[in-house]
């Protein structure tokens, strides 16, 4: 019983409420209530059961027996205040007329310029929906609060909603099944369902599965875009600096200097200096391990500072990194977010080993001076303590290699790689689990067939772990290999398992990395363009060029006059 019209209703005219003069709806008098719900039988299809809940006058109301009637089933109650306000606005134009609607068998609605005729008995099957409440309402005030507008002459209720989605709602009222189209936006569709009060549970299982998959995929994509946008932009909002009472504007300028390289020329120079000091520190760390450099440092030259030049370079780099970390710490408006940042943790790890090394060296020198004149029995204890301190110092020096991670603050690729690992932690975890299971299984199998071979290297399962790890990774150093036929069969299976295992997640990780990298690069480019717009580099260059041209023109004019 569908009736649609493509004519748009451009003007809304409010006319006195009168009984519609139609052939389908007889006039039964103004004081007579219209029966919205007729005697209803059992539902068919998805309308499983209807249980009578209460009776008011001559009208029988039915409540759906929902399984999950929680907050979602009571959401329509939150709109009562807005509906009452809308009803008061429309009722004020209908003062002096009867508040009791006439009895009707059909309901005429206009949604987005398209007209529909619906049976009231069909709408009454779903009294919790908006149209069901409209059909079962016994007062004009209640009906006017449920629609956007009403035309009394044609007895038509107007709704400013999407007609494409309402076509599915109309089919739901007539057939009892809510279908979902793939071209509809999941969020818009859910918003329309929430407005009309229709539950998603009325959709078929096939449509619901596809819809939930698209909704979850959309939510995941939006979440990833928000995280990537947050990484591309500054970590702190500018509104946090405005509410500060303690040097708010100064701290904001300092934060822009440290976190926004394209906000000013000084910020760009600061970013370049940070990367330069990181590279110098890494090169100095590598040169410090060269034997010739150590030999020259031990010989030294008499009468000067015994420290080699590489140690001075190290101290200079640590001083710069310390100053940078303190400036970031002093300018941040949110200490908790600053402490949770992985890049700030990398900055702390870059400078902490140097100060711990100085502290341990101070304790070692004091211990040596204290035990200089001690008896001989304390010499072994002192040597052991110094040896342990030396091992700790070597570990501390090795931790300086983590300074290379400071480049991630200004490297889009490194940040995209870290973001990929965080998003794919489940796939990476499964990969590590499969590798561990393969190492344990194949090492035990090879040990069981190779441990009796004379001169074998598979003396225990622990020794076979190295062979299994090298074989699964398809590296194959050749330092350990099975000699029996059964052992070689296990080796072949181990290598084949490693090839299959390593090939599965590579494509997934690469596709996600390339996707995240391109999106992060786009967000960074947008942020850079915005920051450069604030700095106005082109305006400055144009102004400088105009000044130079004006000066040259003035000089040429002066020469011509002379």
UniProtKB/Swiss-Prot annotation:
Annotated GO MF terms: voltage-gated potassium channel activity
Motif (Selectivity filter): 474-479
Residues covered by region (Disordered): 1-34
GO annotation terms (biological process): protein homooligomerization
Glycosylation, residue list: 457
Membrane-crossing segments per the record: 164-184, 270-290, 345-365, 392-412, 428-448, 489-509
GO CC list: voltage-gated potassium channel complex
Ranges of Basic and acidic residues composition bias in the record: 1-10
One Pfam assignment: BTB_2
Ranges of the Extracellular topological domain: 185-269, 366-391, 449-461, 483-488
Segments on the Cytoplasmic side according to the record's topology features: 1-163, 291-344, 413-427, 510-562
Keyword terms, alphabetized: Cell membrane, Glycoprotein, Ion channel, Ion transport, Membrane, Potassium, Potassium channel, Potassium transport, Transmembrane, Transmembrane helix, Transport, Voltage-gated channel
InterPro entries found in the cross-reference section: Ion_trans_dom, K_chnl_volt-dep_Kv, K_chnl_volt-dep_Kv5/Kv9, SKP1/BTB/POZ_sf, T1-type_BTB, VG_K_chnl, Volt_channel_dom_sf
Parts of the chain in the membrane but not crossing it: 462-482
Membrane-protein topology: Multi-pass membrane protein
Localisation: Cell membrane
Coiled-coil intervals: none
Domain of life from the UniProt record: Eukaryota
Subunit structure, interactors included: Heteromultimer with KCNB1, KCNC1 and KCNF1. Does not form homomultimers.
Family as reported in the entry's similarity comment: Belongs to the potassium channel family. V (TC 1.A.1.2) subfamily. Kv8.2/KCNV2 sub-subfamily.
Domain comment quoted from the record: The segment S4 is probably the voltage-sensor and is characterized by a series of positively charged amino acids at every third position.
Function (record text): Potassium channel subunit. Modulates channel activity by shifting the threshold and the half-maximal activation to more negative values.
Protein known as: Potassium voltage-gated channel subfamily V member 2
